[in-house]
Amino acid sequence: MAENLYIPEISGPLRSFMLKVPEEIQQASGIRVMGKLIKSIVFTTDICIIRNVNADAVIAVYPFTPQPIITQAIMSAADIPVFTGVGGGLTQGKRVVNLSMHAEFQGAIGVVVNAPTSNDVVRQVCDTIDIPVVVTVISEHEDIESRLEAGAKIFNVSAAGKTTNVVREIRKRHPDIPIIATGGPTSESILATIEAGANAITWTPPTNGEVFRDIMNAYRAVSYTHLRAHETD
């Protein structure tokens, strides 16, 4: 009965054009974080994309040392929950704890630490903030049990081509642990990741440049058609 429910959709003429996550992600169970059910998570720090995508949440991590001003900018623009990166690679120790506090104060729904983060730092962060700590897993050799003992609440599996296998191994040992995972580029890879046990899927959107390229190509095609029609007349 529930599968056949009609879902009304409201949009406006100016904002009807947006990026949409793959529909296959809706088959995931989702993770309920602070009362919000999250299935699709867009992987971006681009506020233009964040404001024009139908994902349930954002995972805002980037390959530089985290800066509070960046978190503040994303949080002020986002209209969906944000998981924000607080370091763990280049950034370690007390700074990770301080960045986590700042992220919570700014309204983040969770903080993400990278794989190199020590269990001691994970424990300090968990003891300091009230929002969940998401620990990134990049290999099947990760000591999941020690991460859980340190206080990790969610695992973010990002193991490239091995992601599905890593998710499956974690799920075998821990049936109830929340798992976010990269879904890959195809419908088949997304469904395989969900089948392996992922509760939520991260999706990498096209860049602004890629979206613009398609739009401009369409404009050029229309312009060329009009020009040819004018020449014929």
Pin down the residues of each PLM region:
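Conserved N-terminal beta1-alpha1 strand-loop-helix module at the mouth
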Residues: 1-82, 88-93
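Catalytic beta/alpha-barrel core
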Residues: 38, 58-64, 86-88, 108-117, ...
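Surface-exposed amphipathic alpha-helices with a cationic face
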Residues: 51, 72-76, 122-130, 148, ...
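N-terminal active-site wall of soluble small-molecule enzyme domains
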Residues: 66-105, 116-125, 140-146, 163-167
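Short beta-strand/loop segments at the ligand-binding rim of alpha/beta enzyme cores
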Residues: 78-87, 127-136, 173-182
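Catalytic cores of alpha/beta
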Residues: 98, 143-147, 186-198
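Glycine-rich phosphate-binding active-site loops on the catalytic face of alpha/beta enzymes
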Residues: 108-113, 157-163, 198-216
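Conserved small/polar residues in nucleotide/adenosyl-binding loops
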Residues: 225-232
